[in-house]
Amino acid sequence: MVDNNYAVRLASRNGYIEVVKYLVSIGADIKADDDYAVKWASRYGHLRVVKFLVSQGADIRVNNDYAVQLASENGHFDVVKYLVSQDANIRADDDYAVKLASVNGHVEVVKYLVSQGAVLNQ
């Protein structure tokens, strides 16, 4: 038997929205392992998957708003903007999202996060 919870995380990581939708329809738990599916979708920039998972109840704020940190670290501007629109806390973990975007050279993300209240000098 296939572990649908693990399968939905892998499909989310790879951006396979139709697979994610199907797995959810047959009972995959998108909240398994502290909402890992939405974290992986955010890390790899799969906005459609992130939006779907949020619409199904994924918690973007789990683990100190790790989803927005991962999206920021990897320069996924559209995902960052969406997560912020869904009340992700960009100041979580001592403004770690903007620090990750900075260290990885994602200037567009850095500018956006600062415009939304992130603090650089801590």
From Swiss-Prot:
Keywords: ANK repeat, Repeat
Organism taxonomic ancestry: Viruses, Varidnaviria, Bamfordvirae, Nucleocytoviricota, Megaviricetes
Keyword Repeat: yes
ANK repeats: 3-32, 33-62, 63-92, 94-122
Stretches assigned to coiled coil: none
Pfam families registered for this protein in UniProt: Ank (PF00023), Ank_2 (PF12796)
Organism whose genome encodes this protein: Acanthamoeba polyphaga mimivirus
Top-level division of the source organism's lineage: Viruses
UniProt xrefs under PROSITE patterns: ANK_REP_REGION (PS50297), ANK_REPEAT (PS50088)
Protein name, entry field: Putative ankyrin repeat protein L22
